[in-house]
A protein has these predicted regions:
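Conserved beta-strand/loop scaffold segments within soluble protein domains that form the structured core
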Residues: 111-115, 124-395, 409, 413-447
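N-terminal amphipathic, basic helical "cap/leader" segment at the start of enzyme domains
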Residues: 1-146, 315, 321
Length: 447
């Protein structure tokens, strides 16, 4: 039986149960998503955007699903801290795919700002959710998005009204917890109206050493003159598989800073689709991957320049050890109307062993004639001359290797605008290279 058949059978048998526990706005697009998934099936490696990861194999195991929305016995405020020193944050939790409703007193938000369960707000305020939900994440274009749309029952909704600035960083801790091997389908909808500002940090953790499969779809609407900093930090374990699709819509003069940091995982597949729809917008998309053992990390990006006078910068760096596999495929599309585009795309990779593998494919597709665009990639090993130089000055070979690796990824971390988060990541990355960090050291469950 093909991998997709079990999900087709599941939806045919349980669609009414799924809809019973979901808001009408989410249900309105389920059947169409199901039809699209049936037509597409899981993409094979012959599909350009999925050539480096076998998606059918990821979804082949028989995972459990919490379709009845049974409560998960966990009090995240007692067990998870994920503290970032000197960073003022408002902390929220998503347990599997369910928003944890108990908020801390310090999570006071500016007037009009909403941070809540997507399913709850979709039921209570459909006027806020319906115009945006599944608008960017088109199910006809991607089978994983279609699968998530037909199965997702909850997640996170964030709304920031016009000209409102959220001063405190919003930290969302995604916790995976279950007594069985579990599939989680999480949905996130971010709406920033004109002139709004939001700094957001997602931290992914697994509280149980079980096998998890997570599909996640994030849709982010960034209005005219709005600013969004979206940071995603993954620290799970080798039994965890995560497939994440992020869709970002930028209007005129908006600014997005998107950072993806993968420190621990089993298999991670990240997709980013960002489109410029208004002039004067800019984005900075950065990725840092540290992988060893049998980890597999695949980042795939598309930056779509549809209008003139927009700027995009991408920098992704990988450090691969042992038998780890990394992949980066980045496509920058500059349409004919997008004159005066400025774009830079860079992928740099370090393979610490001969058994680590890196696949890299930066691409420029340009149809305008007045642009400044460049792209490039490198794959190399540690500089033996530099290692020898350090050994001559009393630095051990192991310590020299760690210093070179740390210096290599620092460029990505230093691009983060939140200084306390930047400092925290410097600390986590150093401990990761030293083999001293297996899980988030800020969580009580991980100690």
């Amino acid at each position: 039986m093909k991998s997709e058949q079990q999900y087709i059978d599941l939806y045919q048998q349980a669609s009414q149960l799924i809809k019973t526990h979901s808001a009408d706005v989410l249900n309105a697009v389920r059947d169409e998503a199901f039809a699209d998934f049936k037509v597409q099936g899981f993409p094979t490696k012959k599909v350009e955007r999925y050539k480096y990861t076998d998606m059918a194999a990821l979804f082949a195991p028989d995972y459990g699903l919490n379709l009845k929305r049974l409560p998960i016995p966990v009090d995240p405020y007692e067990t998870f801290t994920c503290d970032v020193p000197n960073l003022s944050t408002s902390v929220y939790f998503v347990v599997n795919d369910g928003f944890y409703t108990q908020a801390l007193p310090q999570n006071k938000l500016p007037e009009g700002v909403i941070i809540d369960s997507l399913n709850r707000i979709a039921a209570e305020r459909p006027d806020l959710v319906a115009p945006y939900y599944a608008g960017l994440a088109q199910t006809k274009d991607d089978a994983i998005t279609a699968l998530n749309t037909m199965l997702a029952q909850d997640g996170l909704f964030i709304y920031v009204p016009k000209q409102v600035k959220v001063d405190r960083t919003i930290q969302v801790i995604n916790i995976l917890r279950a007594d069985v091997e579990l599939m989680v389908n999480r949905r996130v909808l971010l709406v920033l109206e004109e002139g709004a500002e939001l700094k957001l940090l997602f931290c992914d953790h697994a509280a149980d050493n079980r096998r998890f499969l997570t599909t996640q779809v994030i849709e982010a609407y960034v209005g005219e003159g709005a600013q969004l900093e979206l940071n995603c930090l993954e620290e799970t374990h080798l039994k965890n598989t995560r497939v994440s699709n992020v869709y970002i819509d930028q209007q005129a003069n908006s600014r997005v800073n998107h950072n993806v940091i993968t420190l621990h995982n089993g298999i991670t597949r990240n997709r980013l689709d960002l489109v410029f729809k208004g002039e004067g917008a800019e984005c900075h998309c950065n990725g840092c991957v540290i992988a060893d053992k049998s980890q597999h990390v695949d980042n795939n990006t598309l930056i779509d320049h549809r209008v003139p006078h927009c700027t995009s910068n991408e920098l992704y760096k990988y450090v691969l050890d042992d038998n780890a596999v990394g992949a980066f495929a980045g496509r920058v599309l500059v349409r004919q109307e997008a004159q005066k585009t400025v774009s830079q795309e860079t992928n740099q990779n370090l393979c610490a062993t001969k058994t680590a593998h890196m696949f890299t494919q930066p691409m420029l597709e340009i149809y305008a004639d007045d642009v400044k665009c460049a792209h490039g990639s490198t794959v190399g090993q540690l500089n033996n001359d530099a290692l020898f130089y350090m050994q001559q000055r009393g630095i051990s070979k192991r310590e020299g290797k760690l210093l070179l690796q740390f210096a290599f990824v620092n460029e990505v971390i230093d691009k983060m605008e939140l200084v306390p988060l930047r400092d925290r990541l410097h600390h986590l990355v150093e401990k990761r290279f030293r083999g001293e960090l297996n899980k988030c050291e800020g969580c009580q469950l991980c100690k």
